[in-house]
Amino acid sequence: MARRLQDELSAFFFEYDTPRMVLVRNKKVGVIFRLIQLVVLVYVIGWVFVYEKGYQTSSGLISSVSVKLKGLAVTQLQGLGPQVWDVADYVFPAHGDSSFVVMTNFIMTPQQAQGHCAENPEGGICQDDSGCTPGKAERKAQGIRTGNCVPFNGTVKTCEIFGWCPVEVDDKIPSPALLHEAENFTLFIKNSISFPRFKVNRRNLVEEVNGTYMKKCLYHKILHPLCPVFSLGYVVRESGQDFRSLAEKGGVVGITIDWECDLDWHVRHCKPIYQFHGLYGEKNLSPGFNFRFARHFVQNGTNRRHLFKVFGIRFDILVDGKAGKFDIIPTMTTIGSGIGIFGVATVLCDLLLLHILPKRHYYKQKKFKYAEDMGPGEGERDPAATSSTLGLQENMRTS
């Protein structure tokens, strides 16, 4: 055991291997070798350099978005009368940023005032006062219970509450949507971006977009792909959804602005690409999008409000992209990596030559040469030998 360990250590410290070039005249191996090199060459040039632009350094962007909407809608509702709805009425928030809601439908509870009234059946049905704990508010309650059980209508009793009365009843959503004209509303998107690494600034109002063009253009992915004015109906349809059904219960639509810029060309070629996505599926557990807001006023010294349950389309504007420009460092790194990948051809062909082909033993003899130290060198004495020689023994094993 000790002798074997000594031999292993001796071999580790006192042996050295060096590559030996062997020219193999084998058509099969030669063709495979060149094919692998060709595949590597196509990968390095076609994918790494041309498609992935491995010769460029890249930079992310910083972005700012603002929006403006235009359009009018008219409603005729009991308790509210005829009303014209403009952008100040149906856009939330009113200043418009990268995320906003356009109201398309609503349920109004008019003339609410603080007082006592019967709760909505969803907030608590009762048989007598024992079922109404004073001061308690259920999950769907619209006020604080007083402890009394009172008639809600001719057939149902509910707990009396103190809160805004009369309570909201929202089980019937108007169909079609009250603000169905929203399909023709227009949205103007103003987007400014910067690539800080390259000190390049761009806007979506590119060179082709001027004042005259903007007054008459409306975005179309083929006819007017650079127009920053969008029809809400077109945006929703391009997201894969139906505007009328979305307008009734609300939903969410994503608008992406993608900037992929090659700054090796003139900066005017850096242009935005718009895409639209439906972000809520129809089979969502909680379909639609809604929220509530109130209009407060004073009538005969009493604080009152009109309560609106708003159904609307929420638009989220997302900006993404990057810019690339030639740089010698990534270029040299990519070239070096590509040259290294060429070594794959040698490894695979050696595997085929030395372990798979029928004449593998013969090729091993030609590939590897074993050199041994046969004795002391010139000027050295070997007490165990009558003479000093230096020789090389080549072990040739035939297949």
From Swiss-Prot:
GO biological process: apoptotic process; ceramide biosynthetic process; establishment of localization in cell; insemination; monoatomic ion transport; neuronal action potential; platelet activation; positive regulation of calcium ion import across plasma membrane
Residue numbers bearing the Phosphothreonine modification: T389
Binding-site residues, CTP: K68, K70, K140, T186, N290, R292, K309
Region annotation Disordered: where it falls in the sequence: 374-399
Membrane-topology annotation of the record: Multi-pass membrane protein
GO cellular-component term (any): glutamatergic synapse
Primary role: ATP-gated nonselective transmembrane cation channel permeable to potassium, sodium and with relatively high calcium permeability. Furthermore, CTP functions as a weak affinity agonist for P2RX1. Plays a role in male fertility, bladder contraction and platelet aggregation. Specifically, plays an important role in neurogenic contraction of smooth muscle of the vas deferens, and therefore is essential for normal male reproductive function. In addition, contributes to smooth muscle contractions of the urinary bladder.
Official protein name in the record: P2X purinoceptor 1
Organism: Mus musculus
Organism lineage string: Eukaryota, Metazoa, Chordata, Craniata, Vertebrata
Gene: P2rx1
